[in-house]
Amino acid sequence: MNLKEKLLSDMKEAMKSKDSLKLGTIRSVIAAVKNQEIDLRKDLDEEDVLTIVSREVKKRKEAASLYKKGKRPELEDKEIQEMKILQTYLPEQISEEDLRQRIQEVIEETGAEGMKDFGKIMKTLVPEFKGKADNALIKELASEFLN
């Protein structure tokens, strides 16, 4: 069962169990997938759907932080719950320790020295950890090693 089919079956399950939060969250992702399919005029593959789910998780995370700054805990909680629902569809996230180790390996492999080689490292790391680690975290750790 691919990710798109899993989203559809989980949506049906949420309808049956009357879980309105999960239902609304999954519907928004399915809508984003369909909009992307319409824009590109083709069916999306697994990787594209995964990218959309990652984008939706990132949106929820940003919204939660804005609600926190605005002292709106009830809306922040809702965004966090939606984010947790969506994270179940993402591959298991890599630990920061493993990510640090891999960044160190890539730096040694490419012979990177300083921030001038930052692009080389990111070009290798981002596709490798797509969906498994946040790009902002990869960027932060890579720049930490290069400085």
Predicted regions and their residues:
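Charged, compositionally biased, marginally structured helical/coil segments
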Residues: 1-147
